[in-house]
Amino acid sequence: MTKPQNNSTDPREYFTDERCHILELHNTADDPGVSLARARVEPGVTTAWHTVEATIERYIIVSGTGIAEVGDAPALSLIAGDHLLIPAGKKQRIHNPGSVDLIFHCICTPRFERRNYRSLED
């Protein structure tokens, strides 16, 4: 049995090449099974097409509105309280059509690792 751990994360939000802001809430090698981040997409912005290999993502919309495109499925409109499952390796992006920031939590299993991220844009 493992001991309970208290891990601290960097409290600073950062801007990504994907065109969204990320605040890592939990992502450590000590807990490889899961990571949690808060994502923020500014009004009018569409994130870059990308995949995350070997990682399942779940978005939980906190506030704002979004239009998600995953794989070849029709676009999905999202509002606060909605959940979105993104299978590992599926191309994806999200658009904020609203006038306020789109904020969502992103739960990754196993944890997000930069080496698994693939941009599909130039």
Question: What do the PLM-derived regions correspond to, one by one?
Answer:
Residues 30-31, 54, 73, 99-100:
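Short strand-connecting beta-turns/loops that link adjacent beta-strands
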Residues 1-34, 116-122:
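A short, N-terminal "cap"/entry segment at the start of jelly-roll beta-barrel domains
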Residues 37-53:
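Conserved short histidine dyad/triad with adjacent acidic residue
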Residues 46, 53-80, 90:
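A short beta-strand-loop-beta hairpin characteristic of the jelly-roll/cupin
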Residues 22-24, 36-40, 58, 75, ...:
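Conserved hydrophobic/aromatic beta-strand scaffold that supports enzyme active sites
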Residues 40, 56, 119-122:
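Short intrinsically disordered coil segments
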